[in-house]
């Protein structure tokens, strides 16, 4: 089944069904808070956000009686019906900052083909560019300077079959972020900037504003577009041909290693999380999302902070110092989470510290140099003592236990 609901979610469904606002035999008016709750409570890995919202609303309205069994049944039925709906071809345009001369060719993630550094003299690009400019002019008589700068950037175009343009964008963004995650792990900044008038992302490759969905001919599908925060004074990184060659080689090696991982699906999620964490203009968010990344790769849901810190520190050259840094980062994270007053000027330092702290565990998780078969094997490895005397003692005890059991 694509979806699953725990007991506490089922209690919520039961309370919803017995609410006086719900008429007998049907669901009547459903408030957005109920749908929002169920949308975040249900695990549906194969559905986009748009599809999941449709599935929940349809299941709630069509299930004759709100029971756990009927709700799940109608969720799965609705999901299968979406698969059978008419799908159309779409192309999603993503202007990319920092990818000049670096990312080219075609890649496929999931069921999405991505073409990088699209030829803007092609018939599709000419029509798409004209429609993008027209779209913006209908909102303003003059194009913002930022948008003018964006249109000069290289494009990545995602080709996808989908039920509508919103679903097409969500799936395309999900796919291309994996590719940008690969490049970001290799190219993101490792040290703080000496001079910076404002907070800028750590990633050196970014989605630029004004992302649009088009028909295969290039005509824009609707007046909707996606926009993210941007700084008009950002200068794209410059790279020599030798640097570009080295980056591409490292990306290809990392790509091959991820494809062979026993936990490949989760590793691809890590690529998305890494890109998103360090693409923020608000570096406090980068710091917090960096900690979430540590939680994602450092253990299961029940893993405590002390254990996460110990595991991340174990893989560093100086575990004792790294553990102290990890405890400091956790303290700052707790202060921010609870709304305590901190020095905002240290956001950049914290973000880079977090990135550096999680890096060894991240690289080990994505490359699996010790050929572990399960994530838990990696975590157990990181739980071993750092001190050689303690390791020797533990090894002797294990050898003694093995000898005893073999008798």
What feature does the model see in each segment?
Residues 23, 32, 36-285, 361-364, ...:
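Charged, non-catalytic interaction/linker regions at domain boundaries
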Residues 272-278, 313-315, 339-343:
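Glycine- and acidic
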Residues 287-320:
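Flexible secondary-structure boundary motifs
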């Amino acid at each position: 089944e694509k979806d699953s609901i725990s007991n506490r979610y089922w209690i919520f469904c039961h309370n919803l069904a017995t609410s006086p606002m719900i008429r007998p035999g049907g669901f009547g008016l459903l408030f957005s808070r109920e749908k929002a709750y169920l949308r975040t409570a249900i695990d549906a890995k194969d559905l986009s956000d748009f599809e999941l919202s449709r599935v929940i609303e349809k299941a709630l309205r069509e299930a004759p009686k709100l029971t756990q069994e009927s709700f799940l049944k109608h969720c799965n039925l609705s999901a299968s019906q979406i698969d059978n709906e008419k799908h159309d071809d779409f192309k999603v345009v993503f202007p990319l900052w920092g990818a000049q001369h670096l990312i080219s060719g075609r890649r496929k993630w999931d069921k999405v083909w991505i073409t990088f550094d699209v030829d803007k003299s092609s018939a599709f690009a000419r029509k798409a560019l004209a429609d993008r400019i027209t779209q913006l002019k209908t909102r303003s008589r003059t194009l913002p300077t930022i948008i003018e700068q964006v249109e000069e950037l290289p494009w990545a175009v995602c080709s996808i079959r989908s039920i509508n343009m919103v679903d097409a964008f969500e799936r395309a963004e999900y796919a291309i972020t994996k590719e940008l995650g690969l490049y970001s792990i290799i190219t993101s900044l490792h040290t703080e900037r000496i001079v910076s008038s404002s907070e800028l992302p750590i990633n050196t490759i970014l989605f630029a504003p004004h992302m649009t969905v088009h028909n295969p001919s290039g005509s824009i599908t609707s007046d909707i577009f996606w926009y993210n925060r941007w700084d008009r004074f950002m200068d794209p990184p410059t790279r020599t041909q030798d640097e570009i060659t080295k980056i591409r080689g490292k990306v290809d090696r990392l790509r091959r290693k991820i494809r062979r991982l026993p936990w490949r699906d989760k590793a691809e999620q890590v690529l998305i999380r890494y890109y998103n964490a360090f693409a923020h203009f608000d570096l406090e968010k980068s710091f917090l999302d960096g900690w979430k990344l540590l939680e994602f790769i450092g253990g299961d849901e029940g893993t405590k902070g002390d254990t996460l810190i110990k595991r991340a520190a174990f893989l560093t050259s100086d575990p004792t110092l790294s553990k102290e840094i990890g405890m400091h980062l956790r303290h700052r994270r707790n202060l921010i989470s609870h709304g305590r007053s901190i020095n905002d000027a240290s956001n950049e330092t914290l973000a880079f510290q977090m990135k550096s702290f999680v890096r060894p565990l991240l690289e080990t998780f994505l490359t699996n140099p010790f050929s572990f078969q399960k994530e838990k094997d990696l975590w157990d490895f990181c739980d071993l003592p750092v001190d050689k005397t303690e390791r020797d003692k533990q090894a002797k005890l294990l050898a003694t236990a093995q000898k005893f059991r073999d008798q």
